[in-house]
Amino acid sequence: MKFKDKLKFYVITDSNYSDEVISVEESLKGGATSIQLRMKTSSTRKMIEVGNKLRKLTSEYDALFFVNDRLDVAQAVNADGIHVGIDDMPVSKIKEIAPNLIIGASAYNLDEMKTAESEGADYLGVGAVYSTNTKLDARDLGINGLKNISKIANLPIVAIGGINHSNVENVLKCGVSGVAVVSAIVGAENILKSAENMNELIKKYIK
């Protein structure tokens, strides 16, 4: 299976909603194919401690494991990849230091998409498709903006931002390779059930 095929159901951690290890295990049981560890305010030691546990879980479920922003942590926990924003370490520099990592890059507009592609990113995280409380600095792109980027992008696209069970089908109709979800999964009362339901919706569009 190519890495692109594992981008279809991409869950991002958020300890404001639930414990990372518990939420990831339930998400994986429910069909998640990629996990991203995002711990913006935690110490490096804590990130590595949690990251090692998530690496073990993702390996057991044959899912991809990404670390948000932190190349040092991604390397320390033997992650499959890293996801960076436009203000983080340039993709080209990451490729120089860690050529084996899968690199995802955030893109809020066409210029950022072109920058990510030219620097050698492996996939794009495109959004925010809808307003979201989990990333307050995100700029809303909207469905039309997502469609426009999807039409011309040369890389797999993972849509992100405010995606939930009621709007995910509209997002998938834009021709993306996957959807990244935070609160709709890790913030759910029953994470396993929520993940299973989301997985069924995704499978209608991406096999």
From Swiss-Prot:
GO terms for biological process: thiamine biosynthetic process; thiamine diphosphate biosynthetic process. Keywords: Magnesium, Metal-binding, Thiamine biosynthesis, Transferase. Belongs to the thiamine-phosphate synthase family. The keyword Mitochondrion does not apply. It comes from the Archaea. Mg(2+) binds at D69, D88. Its cofactor is Mg(2+). Pathway: Cofactor biosynthesis; thiamine diphosphate biosynthesis; thiamine phosphate from 4-amino-2-methyl-5-diphosphomethylpyrimidine and 4-methyl-5-(2-phosphoethyl)-thiazole: step 1/1. 4-amino-2-methyl-5-(diphosphooxymethyl)pyrimidine binds at Q36, L37, R38, M39, K40, N68, S106, K135. The gene is thiE. SUPFAM superfamilies: Thiamin phosphate synthase. This is Thiamine-phosphate synthase. One of its GO terms (cellular component) is cytoplasm. Its EC number is 2.5.1.3. Pfam families: TMP-TENI (PF02581). It comes from Methanococcus maripaludis (strain DSM 14266 / JCM 13030 / NBRC 101832 / S2 / LL). Coiled coil: none annotated. 2-[(2R,5Z)-2-carboxy-4-methylthiazol-5(2H)-ylidene]ethyl phosphate binds at T132, N133, T134, G162, V182, S183. InterPro entries: Aldolase_TIM (IPR013785), ThiamineP_synth_sf (IPR036206), ThiamineP_synth_TenI (IPR022998), TMP_synthase (IPR034291).
